[in-house]
Amino acid sequence: MALTVKEEEFSNTLIKNASAFDRLKLGNLKNLKIQKKLQFLYLILFVLITGVFFFFLIGNFYSHRKLYQVIKNTKHTTIGFKIDRPHDKVLSSVLKNKLSTYVKESFKFFKSGYAQKGYLGSENDSIELDDVANLMFYGEGQIGTNKQPFMFIFDTGSANLWVPSVNCDSIGCSTKHLYDASASKSYEKDGTKVEISYGSGTVRGYFSKDVISLGDLSLPYKFIEVTDADDLEPIYSGSEFDGILGLGWKDLSIGSIDPVVVELKKQNKIDNALFTFYLPVHDKHVGYLTIGGIESDFYEGPLTYEKLNHDLYWQIDLDIHFGKYVMQKANAVVDSGTSTITAPTSFLNKFFTDMNVIKVPFLPLYVTTCDNDDLPTLEFHSRNNKYTLEPEFYMDPLSDIDPALCMLYILPVDIDDNTFILGDPFMRKYFTVFDYEKESVGFAVAKNL
């Protein structure tokens, strides 16, 4: 039977629509398969990311749990403290002020050969290297029968204890915990006026006596109530610490006062007149101060001692090797208040030039490529022992600026022509004992807890 024109048009349209529908159906099936593949890939990616995240969490938890168990089970007083790292502030400032390109281009400029040698700094630089070398270990202690809390810097380079007084009218004191003698029943008046000078300024006040508490230890102790801290600005206002607890030597103190640890031993509160620092490798912003004894779970291998060569500082004799550059019988100061290894400028400039290390102009950053195979293991030789510091301990990648670039935790500081400071990088690798009775410093490789 023949179709009419309208019926034929309808039939053709139906066939075309059916064909189009088949193509659409086929296309949808293909899209569905692609979607399923993508969903499967997303699932795999999610599982991988989640797995890595949980692996990190579990590993971190296990690591912290081991450390927690050591601290929980130790028979010695151990105080956790925070570490205020000046390099963190420098890098934060670089990012905040959008100087990342400036850092990268500075390195490229001096590497390109346009300059005769890498820029190693000058006295006109806008940020003092001494400022970025300053490190703060600060933990909590209390004063008085009512346990007034204070955040102390634990400082091996000074010997007095001071806190701001309620009578302090300096700008910085307005944000601090202030000592109120009238609130403590164990307060004893002294009133002798005193001032202490630091590299960053002078504080003024008067002597008082009250009960000092550190962890589960307490003792009556003569300290300084500070009434004027203006000279410490702007550092004081911008930092979390309230006062300083000196862990140096008596001859370094104002008023000829025994250090807290020595006084604790005299009062039979601890077994030994010593303290130790343990700085975990996995977390550069915390550390642990132990008073009166040595916790063997913080280190591995032998614990070796070096006799002091100075009656004011924790200073020892070492032959120091920076690759081919050697300083015989150098004075090495072991210092909790220094964020880097420091060396005399004339010694360090030669080393940096050979190692293709440059200083970023107007910033306290010494930079090289992270794959710089020329960087040596630093060696520190005593008469009977050798201590080493591999590049991984004295350099860190500038991840937020350029992952290919690393900064060095080595700075030029001129105390004299043969004095080095072994600060945070050295003490992070080596568990360190400061022993008043042996007049020695002890080192052992720190465990990675």
Swiss-Prot record:
Subcellular location: Membrane; Vacuole lumen
Record-level Gene Ontology MF annotations: aspartic-type endopeptidase activity
Cytoplasmic side: 1-37
Pro-peptide region(s): 1-121
Pfam families in UniProt: Asp
Cellular component, GO annotation: food vacuole; membrane; vacuolar lumen
GO BP of this protein: acquisition of nutrients from host; proteolysis
The keyword Transmembrane is annotated on this UniProt entry: yes
Effect of D335A: Loss of catalytic activity
Reaction(s) the record says it catalyses: Hydrolysis of the bonds linking certain hydrophobic residues in hemoglobin or globin. Also cleaves small molecules substrates such as Ala-Leu-Glu-Arg-Thr-Phe-|-Phe(NO2)-Ser-Phe-Pro-Thr
TM region positions: 38-58
Annotated PANTHER family: BETA-SITE APP-CLEAVING ENZYME, ISOFORM A-RELATED
Function: During the asexual blood stage, catalyzes the cleavage of denatured host hemoglobin (Hb) or globins. Digestion of host Hb is an essential step which provides the parasite with amino acids for protein synthesis, and regulates osmolarity.
Subunit annotation: Component of the hemozoin formation complex (HFC) composed of falcipains FP2A and/or FP2B, plasmepsins PMII, PMIII/HAP and PMIV, heme detoxifying protein HDP and falcilysin FLN. The HFC complex is involved in hemoglobin degradation and detoxification of heme in the food vacuole during the asexual blood stage.
Protein name: Plasmepsin IV
Organism expressing this protein natively: Plasmodium falciparum (isolate HB3)
Organism lineage: Eukaryota, Sar, Alveolata, Apicomplexa, Aconoidasida
